[in-house]
Amino acid sequence: MGIGKDGTLPWKLPGDLKFFKDITVTTSDPSKKNAVVMGRKTWESIPLKFRPLPGRLNVILTRSGSFDFATAENVVICGSLDSALQLLATTPYCLTVEKTFIIGGGEILRQSLNAPACEAIHLTDIESSIECDTFIPPIDLSMFHPWYSSFPVVENGIKHSFISFVRVTKSIAEANDSSGKELTGNDSKKVKFEIENFSFLPKMIFERHEEYQYLNLVQDIIRNGAKKNDRTGTGTVSKFGCQMRFNLRRNFPLLTTKRVFWRGVLEELLWFISGSTNAKVLQEKGIHIWDGNASRQYLDSIGLTQREEGDLGPVYGFQWRHFGAEYTDMHADYVGKGFDQLMDVIDKIKNNPDDRRIILSAWNPTDLKKMALPPCHMFAQFYVENGELSCQMYQRSADMGLGVPFNIASYSLLTCMIAQVCDLSPGDFVHVIGDAHVYRTHVEALEEQMRKQPKPFPILKINPVKKDIDSFVTSDFKLVRYDPHHKIEMKMAV
């Protein structure tokens, strides 16, 4: 990775400098400051009017006895990186310095990246091709994992984003299993982070974890939501008109403050894509998320007495693949009947990517009374920009405890799948919610969940050979490093 040219930064990005300043100046304790450690050449590359870097303890590494720092305040001279870290660990620095940042140059960064004391790496990822003559090695992803990645921005014609990686294993040895195989991971059950608490991150970075969008929304609903009755008789607290946005470029938004049933998310989405409305197909795979709405008792209670148990009616998959076809039962052959919205979406993305009508809708008013449950996540629009595919989904009714973690993952997964089919990269998933509600019976469980600190989101790997939306099977998908907190039980309101 290039970091310099002719002893200076090879790009002019005010946003990059602001990010650097914000992350190295900001402290949680206002009585403390951070230390920035740099080599002599890095110090000399800073314009005279800006050095020493204000609001920080400047630690300069040099073996030159003739080095003159003009008796500047907030400047300390050390002969090596080790001696600098030892000094900062002693009084008075250990009492006044909150965090230590290694900021350059190239050789010092190369020493630091794999050092056991390196807890996190914060970098600006430049996506444009820019000539450099100073480099650092790539991030070792066997030890570090993305925590936060900003949405890409373009400044002075240069596309870039800000990324923070956290150490999740203590050493290279611990990033391997007993057989020596690297745990960068197909089997997420085997991968446990050696580091469990990530509060060592700067507060501004720690709180940018995208899971906080969900946690903060749940907290806001519980504290400030309107108390309402609902069709299940359970009662809710709710808010109207909410939005969350997730970045799909580096990791996958599967919540970590509780274990989300990933296999259920995956199998349900493949079931939707197949056009099936038979809940027994999922039951046979050990997926019981639709059992409550497919039972004999429930179908009878909503007047579908003639409907076979397990037959959900013309729900999501049917509308995606056969919109407008006459629904009879879950056993009928609907091939070639109705309008295949999913294939239409894919065709438009491939052949008319600027179309503003790339829509997938499960809301069909003429079929609502035939459905075991009218669509909650009902409308998705896709958007193509600079080789990336983004999706915005509208959800009329959102069960924040049980449904929303599933919905975030499901539509993020759908976006990633369609992107691959269309030779694009995943961009954003935007989740827009009408009635965002917490069932009163879920409040205690959600309060437990809100006490948990997020862990890094996993990374999703999809079999790159698959280019047909109907060809995907469960073995085509692998989660890398999903290590959530334990499962939190919540009972579904039916």
From Swiss-Prot:
Positions of dUMP binding: 231, 377, 395-399, 407, 437-439
Binding site for NADP(+): 2-8, 40-42, 61-64, 104-111
GO terms under biological process: dTMP biosynthetic process; methylation; one-carbon metabolic process; tetrahydrofolate biosynthetic process
Gene3D superfamilies, per database record: Dihydrofolate Reductase, subunit A, Thymidylate synthase/dCMP hydroxymethylase domain
Span list, region Thymidylate synthase: 170-494
Keyword annotations from UniProtKB, A to Z: Methyltransferase, Multifunctional enzyme, NADP, Nucleotide biosynthesis, One-carbon metabolism, Oxidoreductase, Transferase
UniProt-annotated binding residues for substrate: 16, 103, 124
Gene Ontology MF terms in the entry: dihydrofolate reductase activity; thymidylate synthase activity
Pathway, per record: Cofactor biosynthesis; tetrahydrofolate biosynthesis; 5,6,7,8-tetrahydrofolate from 7,8-dihydrofolate: step 1/1
Every DHFR domain range: 1-167
Residues the record marks as active site: 376
One GO cellular component, as annotated: mitochondrion
EC number: 1.5.1.3, 2.1.1.45
Catalyzed reactions: (6S)-5,6,7,8-tetrahydrofolate + NADP(+) = 7,8-dihydrofolate + NADPH + H(+); dUMP + (6R)-5,10-methylene-5,6,7,8-tetrahydrofolate = 7,8-dihydrofolate + dTMP
Function: Bifunctional enzyme. Involved in de novo dTMP biosynthesis. Key enzyme in folate metabolism. Can play two different roles depending on the source of dihydrofolate: de novo synthesis of tetrahydrofolate or recycling of the dihydrofolate released as one of the end products of the TS catalyzed reaction. Catalyzes an essential reaction for de novo glycine and purine synthesis, DNA precursor synthesis, and for the conversion of dUMP to dTMP.
Protein family (similarity comment): In the N-terminal section; belongs to the dihydrofolate reductase family.
PANTHER family: BIFUNCTIONAL DIHYDROFOLATE REDUCTASE-THYMIDYLATE SYNTHASE-RELATED (PTHR11548:SF15), THYMIDYLATE SYNTHASE 1 (PTHR11548)
HAMAP family: Thymidy_synth_bact
Name this polypeptide is given: Putative bifunctional dihydrofolate reductase-thymidylate synthase
Organism of this sequence: Oryza sativa subsp. japonica (Rice)
